[in-house]
């Protein structure tokens, strides 16, 4: 059976196998409906037009893999499985961390789409996980677009989650979940950036919905939870001082691992002379940063300066420069 609480079950990658097996082996619509039901509210499931969207779902992507070192010390992929519009490729770097690139061949997400990533990183492994291009959230009819990612990090590993930015178009609806499962000596650096309409293109988001959640576990205990929700006229709401102060770009950075207090002091020292608007603090062993901007180049420049503080353990993905 598929349980309703994704964030609890997502710590076990078998959940993804159960879900996908149910979804792809369904021989009747009732089987299909039962498999996908945990990701939608009862109200959504009862709408006839939404039921039609479920039957005619545009994209269902799935990546499930394990990354670790071979006997000769080279990072490689084990147990690689992918379906639908999602692909994963490992790029080796000689002087930087190797990169696992998630590719969405559909070119974005829209109503009813569902993307699932389940990635396990073995102990003593350094890895950058990123995406090939910016994710685009297109206009949705009734159902939300869905993106779920589960990352398990082994002991003494350095793993970063640095996808390219997510662009939110007018009418976009997104439910996104990022679940991180750490061991005692795991090190994790995560970045998520949202762009509400491209100002250079004159785009505004007059209607939309975002339901975004990050949860970090260590040794199966909840360490940090962050939920961001906004609905309605997003362009109007982001003008409020307690929301985005008129900025349309919002970036969240988290780090948990070794030398966290040292990094915090260096970041706060950097903040004194920085031109960027951001805040930093440590909550329950997790270093948090929130950055606001109107130009994506400011965010990227900031992140470029930020990763230098962490030394050789983390670096910006090379694909960001293409």
Which role fits each region the language model picked out?
Residues 75, 129, 139, 171, ...:
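Short acidic, gly/pro-rich beta-turn/loop elements at beta-sheet edges
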Residues 2-155, 159-165, 170, 308, ...:
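N-terminal, charged/glycine-rich beta-strand/loop interface patches
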Residues 45, 52, 56-62, 66-83, ...:
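N-terminal intrinsically disordered, cationic/polar leader segments
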Residues 19-27, 31-33, 194, 198-322:
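A structural signal for small-residue-enriched, beta-sheet-centric alpha/beta enzyme cores
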């Amino acid at each position: 059976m598929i349980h309703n609480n994704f964030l609890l079950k997502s710590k076990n990658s078998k959940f993804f196998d159960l879900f996908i097996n149910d979804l792809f082996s369904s021989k009747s619509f009732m089987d299909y409906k039962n498999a996908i039901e945990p990701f939608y509210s009862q109200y959504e499931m009862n709408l006839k037009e939404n039921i039609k969207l479920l039957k005619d779902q545009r994209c269902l992507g799935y990546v499930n893999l394990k990354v670790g070192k071979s006997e000769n010390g080279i990072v490689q992929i084990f147990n690689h499985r992918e379906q639908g519009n999602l692909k994963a490729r490992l790029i080796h770097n000689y002087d930087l961390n190797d990169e696992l690139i998630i590719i969405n061949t559909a070119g974005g997400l829209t109503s009813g789409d569902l993307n699932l990533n389940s990635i396990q990183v073995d102990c003593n492994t350094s890895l950058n996980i990123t995406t090939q291009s910016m994710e685009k959230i297109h206009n949705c009819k009734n159902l939300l677009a869905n993106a779920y990612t589960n990352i398990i990090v082994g002991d003494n590993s350095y793993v970063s989650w640095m996808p390219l930015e997510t662009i939110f178009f007018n009418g976009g609806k997104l439910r996104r979940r990022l679940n991180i499962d750490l061991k005692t000596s795991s090190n994790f650096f995560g970045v998520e950036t949202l762009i509400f309409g491209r100002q250079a293109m004159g785009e505004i988001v007059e209607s939309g919905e975002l339901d975004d959640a990050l949860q970090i576990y260590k040794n199966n205990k909840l360490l940090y939870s962050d939920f961001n929700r906004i609905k309605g006229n997003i362009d109007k709401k982001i003008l409020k001082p307690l929301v985005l102060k008129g900025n349309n770009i919002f970036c969240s950075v988290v780090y948990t691992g070794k030398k966290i207090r040292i990094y915090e002091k260096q970041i706060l020292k950097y903040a004194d002379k920085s031109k960027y608007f951001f805040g930093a603090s440590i909550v329950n062993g997790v270093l948090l940063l929130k950055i606001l901007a109107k130009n994506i180049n400011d965010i990227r420049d900031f992140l470029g300066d930020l990763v230098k503080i962490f030394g050789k353990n983390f670096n910006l993905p090379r694909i960001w420069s293409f």
